[in-house]
UniProtKB/Swiss-Prot annotation:
EC identifiers of the protein: 3.1.1.29
Keyword annotations: Cytoplasm, Hydrolase, RNA-binding, tRNA-binding
Signal peptide from the UniProt entry: none
Principal location: cytoplasm
Leading EC class: hydrolase
Protein's job: Hydrolyzes ribosome-free peptidyl-tRNAs (with 1 or more amino acids incorporated), which drop off the ribosome during protein synthesis, or as a result of ribosome stalling.
Official protein name in the record: Peptidyl-tRNA hydrolase
Residues the entry annotates as binding tRNA: 18, 68, 70, 116
Alphabetized Pfam families for the sequence: Pept_tRNA_hydro
Catalytic activity: an N-acyl-L-alpha-aminoacyl-tRNA + H2O = an N-acyl-L-amino acid + a tRNA + H(+)
Active site, renumbered: 23
Matching PROSITE patterns: PEPT_TRNA_HYDROL_1, PEPT_TRNA_HYDROL_2
Residue(s) at site: Stabilizes the basic form of H active site to accept a proton: 95
C-alpha cells in the first residue's frame, strides 16, 4: 500500500455489555465516522471488524479490534503488517481519563499513560510514533466526578447522559478535524481538534 493508505482504529471492548462505557469512547466515535464516510460493508478479519472508505482522496480503513482492550495490539499489528501501513498513517482513537469529558487532543507518539490498549499496541507494533486521538472522559475526583469511584470501575461504567451529550456533541467538529488531517496535514488537524475543550 502506498503513502495515501490510512488506518483509523477505535479502541473499546467487544460485546454489548461494554458498548456505551467510557472505555469504549474510541469505538463509539468510530461507529459515527463509519456511518459518515463508509459505503462498504463491514469485513471481519485480522482479529477486527473494519470498513473501507475514501476521505479527501485517500483510502482509509476504519477498524474496531475484536480483542479485549488489553490485547488490542494483536489486531492492529496484524493489519499494519499485512498492509504495510506506515506509522504516520495510523490514528488510534481512545479514551483519556486525564482530560475533561469532551476535550479532544491529537498527539503523535508518547507513552501509554496507563492505558492498557495503547500499551498493547505499542508493544505489538514495536514503535510508538503513530497518531492518537484522545477523547476526554474525566477522572474520579476531578471534572465534577465523585472521588470515591475506583478508576477501573469508572471507565467500565456507562457514560452519564450529560457526558455522552457533551462527547457526541463534538462529533461533527471531530469529523471535520480528521478530514483536515487527510486533506491538509496533521498540524492543521491538530489546530482544529486540540481547540475542542
Amino acid at each position: 500500500m502506498g503513502v495515501n493508505e490510512y488506518l483509523l482504529v477505535g479502541l473499546g471492548n467487544p460485546g454489548r455489555e461494554y458498548q456505551d462505557t467510557r472505555h469504549n469512547a474510541g469505538s463509539l466515535l468510530l461507529d459515527d465516522l463509519s456511518s459518515r464516510w463508509s459505503g462498504s460493508n463491514s469485513i471481519e478479519k485480522y482479529n477486527s471488524t473494519f470498513r473501507k472508505a475514501r476521505v479527501a482522496g485517500n483510502s482509509l480503513a476504519l477498524m474496531q479490534p475484536l480483542t479485549y482492550m488489553n490485547r488490542s495490539g494483536l489486531a492492529v499489528a496484524e493489519y499494519v503488517r499485512f498492509f504495510k501501513i506506515v506509522a504516520e498513517n495510523i490514528i488510534v482513537i481512545h479514551d483519556d481519563i486525564d482530560m475533561a469529558p469532551g476535550r479532544v487532543k491529537l498527539v503523535r507518539g508518547g507513552g501509554a499513560g496507563g492505558h492498557n490498549g495503547i500499551k498493547s499496541i505499542n508493544s505489538s507494533l514495536g514503535f510508538v510514533d503513530y497518531y492518537r486521538l484522545k477523547i476526554g472522559v474525566g477522572r474520579p475526583g476531578k471534572h465534577g466526578i465523585h472521588p470515591e469511584i475506583p478508576v477501573d470501575k469508572y471507565v467500565l461504567a456507562p457514560f452519564s447522559a450529560e457526558q455522552l451529550d457533551i462527547i457526541v456533541g463534538r462529533y461533527d467538529a471531530i469529523a471535520a478535524g480528521l478530514e483536515t488531517f487527510f486533506r491538509d496535514s496533521p498540524a492543521a488537524a491538530a489546530t482544529v481538534l486540540n481547540s475542542l475543550r
